[in-house]
Amino acid sequence: MPLITTETGKKMHVLEDGRKLITVIPGDGIGPECVEATLKVLEAAKAPLAYEVREAGASVFRRGIASGVPQETIESIRKTRVVLKGPLETPVGYGEKSANVTLRKLFETYANVRPVREFPNVPTPYAGRGIDLVVVRENVEDLYAGIEHMQTPSVAQTLKLISWKGSEKIVRFAFELARAEGRKKVHCATKSNIMKLAEGTLKRAFEQVAQEYPDIEAVHIIVDNAAHQLVKRPEQFEVIVTTNMNGDILSDLTSGLIGGLGFAPSANIGNEVAIFEAVHGSAPKYAGKNVINPTAVLLSAVMMLRYLEEFATADLIENALLYTLEEGRVLTGDVVGYDRGAKTTEYTEAIIQNLGKTPRKTQVRGYKPFRLPQVDGAIAPIVPRSRRVVGVDVFVETNLLPEALGKALEDLAAGTPFRLKMISNRGTQVYPPTGGLTDLVDHYRCRFLYTGEGEAKDPEILDLVSRVASRFRWMHLEKLQEFDGEPGFTKAQGED
């Protein structure tokens, strides 16, 4: 059989014998051990799967492939559409891109799903609280777009990109997931009180889409309060949908509530491809010692089976895992201490021996087929009735103090249809002076407002920039636009 699309919108490769073909990437560090243990359990459970094993990560970087993902791996994923992946080493600082992020962005796996639940016999201060929640993290936008520039030799900039399309997709995904898992409440965590345009886009999308799901309670929460509430009363949460950076932080926090990253699976799901992996890293210091806990990768495989709509096999494996933990005789070193913890192979064998058994105290949640949400595919889904360029922010590098810079820019703008409105330094207005005490850096935003008829024209803007450039080094321009009469830009701290 060829690549098929299910009634719920998922794409998968089904072989003639009915098995579903997936790509397996063993990964780096402890990854191969975790994946090997998981494949043994899948095979013992007679999961109807076939595998193509491919590589990514450290070995690929060593071959000089800067993305960390070779073409043969990309071709396999395009064929199978489903990936089970071990952790990959991530370069730190300068150098290659993260292969993890490359895979997510290459295949537009826009939804990162990280379930968290209490496990039996896993020590945690929250034992008995009934924690059972899912963090749904937008996976390709935000600061993780990775668009960075050195503005001056000592000032760096990262662009935080949040789109309406990306926000609507992740919000719809969260509500559909809540329905499929029988959950009754979705929280949206943003920092829209500070980043009113970027983070505010997710908040506005959430409030609009929530009206289509009257059976689910929709609650907006500021992200720092979400972190506070997760520590104080985590059982109040069922689904949290949030932006990329916020989700990265909150999901690691939630995994700490239930015993650590060894019990934290995840899925990266898009309209075309789904990638399943543990949240934890490659932990090279434990590699090859047969002591690691493969539970996170195994639970990621359980998530994969449910995505493939192999619910019976998923329940079989999850029940065996929960029975093993509940029994408490064979537990790994991260749970009971490495001096007396079971070997990885012993733990894996215990789970296999418990296939077909049901835990007495811990129940597996009921799952229904999850429907991938559909959104407007237009590149520009929002078309304003009117728009107007009302000015320009010119970013310059200089060691001048604000008053000297302001006077110089006012002289340079004389005779143009622009007036200098204000100058800010790291977001705080420093000219005209407000009486504040600002520690300055060599990066100024200089805001010019248009005083001519209609809107500012490109030749007029370029003439202004040319005048500024005759005296100062500039590195960045931003048009100030109004959409339907509303400003598409924010004010500096202290700006009137």
UniProtKB/Swiss-Prot annotation:
PROSITE patterns named among the record's database cross-references: IDH_IMDH
Oxidoreductase among keywords: yes
Entry GO MF terms: isocitrate dehydrogenase (NAD+) activity; isocitrate dehydrogenase (NADP+) activity; magnesium ion binding; NAD binding
Site (Critical for catalysis): 144, 191
Family recorded in the similarity comment: Belongs to the isocitrate and isopropylmalate dehydrogenases family.
Record's subunit section: Homodimer.
Protein name: Isocitrate dehydrogenase [NADP]
Species this protein is from: Thermus thermophilus (strain ATCC 27634 / DSM 579 / HB8)
